[in-house]
């Protein structure tokens, strides 16, 4: 592990200047690997890499009587979401006390975060906050409360925020954004208190202290009061929602909560799978906190019909749920450029069939299936290559799978404008998501962008992907590389789906159109 120089580290704010994976590895694995007995260090590294299966497998190799095992078991239990059991195990550890103390601190932090409830106690369905009358003499002023943002994080979540606020500005809404307390300094970046990205104002709540929810809510209320906002609009997760709710109730403002995903289910898919993780303390608490914020909101926005159904199953009244699906900016509907010319421009062989994904690289995306499908298709005689454009926590895993011949390439993170170039260079865009509760419910942004560029989309056959594409795609069973390889051989037979998909996006998925729903939702909160 390469460490940064101390002067640079101190100048950038100590450990906050490191990326999150770097900080975790320094915290969990630094100095713990014993070359004579590497097993404890390997367990620490598995925990640092968020690899529960590997951590549990290695832990099982340790003798029960090994005095080092309790602290390691505590770390693995914490990773598995069993917060109380982890803390108990850590307190019983007689060796590895530094590791045990880290577990206890982290368990306390999680318990504080997951134990928080909206001010005034848990909201009952239908309970509302009295709000002040809206101002009639000037444009509606909305403050969006988000977890992360451009330019520091580029993902579907941050691109959606940028697109929504840009559209609202053109519609006469005075919309601004504030990011979570401590962002982006806690992620290792230095930032001003306000940054502007293409006319969108991002306020930063910088803090040298931890992101306590009550402190977050108080700082948020101060900013909202200073900006004289009319509506507080928070987006996933419950920490944002809880803080915005504190501020809204303090100021008498309407509170809108936008459910962009189910983060507890995303976590579950990485930590033992849906069935096992759903019974853990962390999952249950996170789901309860999310539900409480949904029930307390004056209006709830979400992305898809399946997600709306899930909200209703939690007790949210259907007439308070508003759908704002993912859309595309107008430049995605510019004329499509010649694919052969774009292949040359992007360094790809123009005669070869090129497919790929433009995505954040998470395990949910199922990219190993794409790599294997290309291998199978090439073994069957198809001259096909794949490009993976993006970055993320699963990138190292994907890189290990890439062949040495350059037929599958991982490009890394690119600017949004370059993402459009890559779409135009591909013959088909593949969305090989795994089958899990979260992928069945949550609709991603990237397939809509691909259709806007008239690209054939080949996607896992999941309800969320059928809705996200309007059915204008080819569908294969998740995790079935052989079936995907067969679809790759038939790309030329189905290019018309991309053309039809572009027409559908033009009609129904422009940001400037889908974002008009927000005005109706805001107006509804003012009438409560």
Predicted feature residues:
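A short, well-ordered alpha-helix in the C-terminal region of glycosyltransferases
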Residues: 495-508
């Amino acid at each position: 592990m390469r460490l940064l120089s101390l002067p640079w580290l101190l100048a950038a704010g100590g450990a906050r200047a490191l990326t999150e994976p770097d900080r975790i590895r320094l915290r969990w694995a630094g100095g713990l690997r014993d070359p004579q007995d590497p097993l404890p260090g390997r367990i620490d590294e598995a925990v640092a890499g968020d690899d529960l299966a590997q951590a549990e497998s290695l832990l099982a190799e340790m003798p029960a009587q090994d005095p080092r095992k309790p602290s390691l078991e505590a770390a693995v239990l914490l990773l598995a979401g069993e917060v109380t059991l982890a803390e108990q195990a850590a307190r019983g550890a007689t060796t590895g006390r530094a590791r045990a103390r880290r577990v206890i601190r982290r368990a306390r932090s999680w318990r504080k975060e997951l134990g928080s409830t909206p001010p005034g106690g848990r909201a009952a369905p239908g309970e509302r906050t009295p709000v002040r009358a809206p101002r009639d003499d000037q444009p509606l002023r909305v403050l969006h409360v988000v977890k992360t943002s451009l330019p520091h994080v580029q993902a579907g979540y941050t691109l959606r925020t940028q697109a929504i606020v840009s559209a609202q500005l053109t519609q006469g809404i005075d919309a601004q954004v504030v990011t979570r307390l401590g962002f982006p300094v806690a992620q290792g970046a230095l930032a001003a208190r306000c940054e502007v990205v293409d006319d969108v104002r991002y306020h930063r709540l910088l803090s040298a202290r931890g992101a306590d929810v009550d402190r977050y809510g108080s700082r948020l209320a101060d900013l909202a009061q200073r900006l004289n906002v009319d509506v507080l609009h928070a987006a996933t997760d419950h920490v944002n929602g809880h803080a915005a709710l504190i501020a809204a109730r303090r100021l008498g403002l309407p509170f809108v909560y936008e459910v962009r995903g189910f983060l507890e289910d995303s976590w579950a898919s990485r930590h033992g799978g849906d069935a096992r993780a759903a019974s853990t303390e962390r999952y249950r608490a996170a789901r309860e906190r999310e539900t409480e914020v949904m029930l307390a909101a004056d209006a709830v926005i979400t992305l898809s019909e399946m997600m709306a159904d899930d909200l209703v199953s939690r007790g949210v009244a259907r007439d308070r749920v508003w759908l704002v699906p993912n859309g595309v900016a107008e430049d995605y509907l510019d004329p499509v450029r010649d694919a052969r010319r774009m292949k040359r421009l992007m360094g790809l062989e123009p005669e070869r069939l090129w497919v790929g994904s433009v995505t954040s690289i998470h395990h949910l995306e199922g990219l190993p299936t794409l790599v294997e499908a290309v291998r199978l298709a090439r073994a069957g005689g198809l001259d096909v290559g794949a490009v993976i454009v993006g970055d993320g926590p699963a990138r190292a895993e994907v890189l290990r799978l890439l062949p040495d011949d350059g037929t599958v390439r991982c490009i890394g993170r690119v600017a949004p404008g370059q993402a459009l170039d890559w779409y135009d260079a591909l013959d088909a865009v593949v969305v090989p998501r795994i089958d899990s509760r979260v992928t069945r419910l949550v609709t991603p942004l990237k397939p809509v962008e691909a259709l806007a560029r008239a690209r054939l989309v080949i996607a896992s056959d999941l309800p969320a992907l059928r809705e996200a594409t309007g059915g204008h795609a080819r569908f294969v069973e998740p995790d079935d590389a052989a079936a995907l390889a067969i679809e790759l051989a038939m790309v030329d037979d189905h290019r018309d789906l991309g053309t039809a998909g572009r027409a559908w996006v033009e009609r129904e998925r422009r940001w400037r159109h889908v974002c008009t729903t927000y005005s109706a939702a805001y107006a509804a909160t003012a009438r409560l």
